[in-house]
UniProtKB/Swiss-Prot annotation:
Pathway: Cell wall biogenesis; peptidoglycan biosynthesis. It is a multi-pass membrane protein. Catalyzes the initial step of the lipid cycle reactions in the biosynthesis of the cell wall peptidoglycan: transfers peptidoglycan precursor phospho-MurNAc-pentapeptide from UDP-MurNAc-pentapeptide onto the lipid carrier undecaprenyl phosphate, yielding undecaprenyl-pyrophosphoryl-MurNAc-pentapeptide, known as lipid I. The gene is mraY. This is Phospho-N-acetylmuramoyl-pentapeptide-transferase.
């Protein structure tokens, strides 16, 4: 929205065109805007959640240190998502179909997560939205979105899967393979981030790092100078440049949320936040065809999800025997005696290393 205002004002005030003509400037401005919105609205929202008694539900079989988290305000993901949408509408180019798709993803998955949280925390339904209903909604949306993205990206000739650490090695993809891969990426990422969000600040830092990494790739691929210099296929579509702008909004809002979510957490994001952030990261990776880079940078999420799958599989196939003391795996380390803060910081370090490996792939090709 502001891009059009500054474009008009630039005819009367020299220098203001930088706010409408340069993606890099808008990346900076949207990150600052989303950060300030989240910081400004964070405290009032926490007080409102406390007043409404919308608090965290803690598992009875979990670590004893978690009992103090009971009734900590949750559904704070609404704060993140609202900040991202407002910032995107302010600083994004509203002519970009990709920006609107990302906003739609935030709204749809946010609605699923919100309804799930509402059932569990407000109506006191023990299991919330049934898993099969949640999966059905996610699946239908993901398949439709995958088909839409296939036709949009095929117009730009973006139907090759990029292989990290190589210059010209790509895997061509038809509609069937593309839809299947996109389906698993969106749903897998959504649920993996949801499983990771179990300790104070644990999920939001990896989310910010992955969003930053994907944003860097999006910026490079839509900038002809950088793309040619770094030997990336140039995407001649300014609409996709808005993906980098959107990633910056995720980073700003995520960092501000960490202010309230760091140990001891004053608020949790809930399913409304974790399900949505995971889904939107998956969609971004597909849009810029960096699915494998997303896998590398987000490997922490993959490990968390795999630990749950292995635990459930072992319990069912081995007569109740478990691999881990508790799943997801961050709880396993807690039950081994690691303090919560040590688990979180060490997982952040792992996530940072994975982020840096993903960035190394920009140059080492």
């Amino acid at each position: 929205m502001l891009i059009y205002l500054f474009n008009w004002l630039s005819h009367y005030y020299k220098g203001l065109e930088v706010f409408s003509s340069y993606v890099s400037v808008r990346i900076i401005m949207i990150s600052i805007t989303s950060l300030l919105i989240t910081l400004f609205l964070g405290r009032p929202m926490i007080r409102w959640l406390q007043k409404m008694q919308i608090g965290q539900v803690v598992r009875d079989d979990g670590p004893q240190s978690h009992f103090s988290k009971r009734n900590t305000p949750t559904m704070g993901g609404v704060l993140i998502l609202s900040s991202v949408i407002i910032s995107a509408l302010l600083w994004g180019s509203l002519s970009s179909i990709y920006l609107w798709i990302l906003i739609l993803v935030v709204i749809f998955f946010g609605a699923i997560g919100f309804f799930d949280d509402y059932l569990k925390l407000v109506l006191k339904h023990p299991k919330g939205l049934r898993a099969k209903h949640k999966f059905a909604l996610q699946s239908i949306f993901s398949i439709i979105l995958a088909i839409v993205l296939f036709y949009l990206l095929s117009k730009n000739g973006q139907m090759n899967l990029s292989i990290p650490f190589t210059k010209n090695l790509h895997i061509p993809m038809g509609i069937f393979l593309f839809v299947v891969l996109t389906f698993f990426i969106i749903n897998g990422s959504s649920n993996a981030v949801n499983l990771t969000d179990g300790l104070d600040g644990l999920a939001i830092v990896p989310v910010v790092l992955v969003a930053a990494g994907l944003g860097i790739y999006a910026y490079i691929q839509t900038n002809s100078v950088l793309a040619n210099y770094l030997l990336f296929p140039y995407i001649n579509n300014q609409g996709l440049a808005e993906v980098a702008v959107f990633c910056a909004a995720l980073c700003g809002s995520g960092l501000a949320f960490l202010w309230f979510n760091s140990h001891p957490a004053e608020v949790f994001m809930g399913d409304v936040g974790s399900l949505t952030l995971g889904a939107v990261l998956g969609v971004i990776a597909v849009m810029i065809r960096q699915e494998l880079i997303f896998f590398i940078m987000g490997l922490l999420f993959v490990v968390e999800a795999l630990s749950v799958m292995l635990q459930v599989g072992s319990y069912k196939l081995r007569n109740g025997k478990r691999i881990f003391k508790m799943a997801p795996i961050h709880h396993h380390f807690e039950l081994m005696g690691w303090p919560e803060t040590k688990v979180v910081i060490r997982f952040w370090i792992v996530s940072l290393i994975l982020f840096l490996i993903g960035l190394v792939a920009i140059k080492v090709r």
